[in-house]
Amino acid sequence: MTARGRRQELALRIVVPEAGWVQVRPVVDGRDILAEPPAGWSGEDPWVVLGPGGLAAVDEHPHEVRLARISCTEVCCGALYVTVRREGDEVVWDGWRNPAGGSADLPEFRFEAARYEAEVHRAALDRGWEWPARTVAGLLAERLRADADWSRRWECELEAVWTSPDEPERLELVLIHPDLRAEQDGRPWLQLGVALDAGDGDPAAEAQRLAARLAGGDRQEMAEVWGRSWHYAEDFA
């Protein structure tokens, strides 16, 4: 127990829908908290929630984690952020925010730190749901984010690599031109998409092959415009 009230219990459920992205559904005291905001929310991808900078990166310095989104870019369609921090032997979730200005009215949650860390660790290690192209997508994302030359040459930053169970061999790269902060800073931006097919070989070798293809490829030939800020009236060239 704490001076501010009862501690909650956290469970992180990985949901693989028939179509769409894999979701992490945070369940607090048996209640799916993403079912409470307006209809249409989907849990965020495990790479975002459980990866670097996600729920496991907890100390006394608060940081935001995106727990849910709808689709497209978050300023357009909305997303759900929570601020995560450590207070003594507790982990606190509060400061809920929706960049699109919609509802983000959720209460503060407090978890016992040891139990919280154990649950996040368990969920991060659970890969039983993953299919081969999903593994390739994760490895490819790591390579591209570490390749500053590719990002500079393409004048883009990688937002995500999508793959879905209904098209298990297809990868879709989501890129933002000129960079990921453009939308937040109010600068012109474009969302670009690149479709790739993953082979059935070793995932690490497939990721290397696709990264090499992108490194030697031309953005104008490989990418399509998927979305844009109001600043752009015509297709990006």
Could you say what each language-model-derived stretch is?
Residues 1-13, 49-52, 139-162:
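Charged, amphipathic alpha-helical segments
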Residues 1-48:
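N-terminal "first-domain core" detector
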Residues 19-20, 43, 51-83, 148-188:
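Amphipathic, interaction-prone secondary-structure segments
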Residues 31-41, 101-112, 182-198:
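Short amphipathic beta-strand/extended segments with alternating polar/hydrophobic composition
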Residues 91-95:
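Short hydrophobic/aromatic-rich beta-strand segments that constitute the beta-sheet cores
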Residues 96-151:
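Surface-exposed beta-loop interaction hotspot
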Residues 154-237:
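Preference for solvent-exposed, low-hydrophobicity sequence contexts
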